[in-house]
Amino acid sequence: GAARVKELVEEEKHSLSGTFRLGVLPTVAPYLLPRFFPRLRKEHPETDLRVVELKTKEICQALREGILDAAILVRLPETEGYVQTPLYYEQFVVYVSRGEALFDRTSIRTSDLEGEPLWLLDEGHCFRDQLVKFCHLPAAREAQKTYTLGSIETFMRMVEGGQGVTFIPELALEQLTVEQKELVRPFALPIPTRQVVLLTTGDFVRHSLRDLL
């Protein structure tokens, strides 16, 4: 992710002045932005980067209406029709509290999640939608074993407090402490993954800014 961003930065370094409005998914922003935003501010102070966190549907609408210049989100059917610059692939991992039976497993199968108290994002988040589909979680929702709140970070705090199971993206692992990493369990094969891309419209002309990101 960060290496790809750096590679794009080296391609063009002109026409970087002015305001650039970037939409980012809430499940991507906390883990990707800290990797390049400080360097961008230091090396290109003339670039006024405005970042807003939005869900996929909101981002696509804002791009169509010209409210955003570009967006960082996950490649989905909804993103087809836009100019897509691949940034990176990443896996999902399971975050398990010490009080759950799954904590003793070295890897997690999707069938292991049935009946578990899962912390999931609200509907409309592609992060949730991908995992619900991959892990066959509707049955868990119907059994009222799945609860919803607002952010991955909130769910992580709940798990660390001894409550339930949640999912986090691979890029988040770099920010975890040794103690937090003890709660991480990989999925058994097949492993759910996502592709993070930079999205722009076909008439986007500030290519230097796009390449910078």
What residues fall within each predicted segment?
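Short beta-strand->loop
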Residues: V83-V93, T166, E170-L173, V178-T193
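Alpha-to-beta junction loops
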Residues: T47, L63-I72, F92, V159-V165, ...
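Secondary-structure junction motif
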Residues: P117-P138, R206-S208
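Flexible hinge/capping segments at coil-to-helix
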Residues: K13, T79-L118, G202, R210
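Hydrophobic residues within well-ordered alpha-helices
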Residues: L22, A62-R64, L113, R157-Q163, ...
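Alpha-helical linker/hinge and terminal dimerization helices associated
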Residues: G1-K13, L213
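A late-sequence structural motif
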Residues: L32, L183-L213
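Central regulatory/effector-binding core of bacterial HTH transcription factors
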Residues: S17-E80, R141, T148-S151
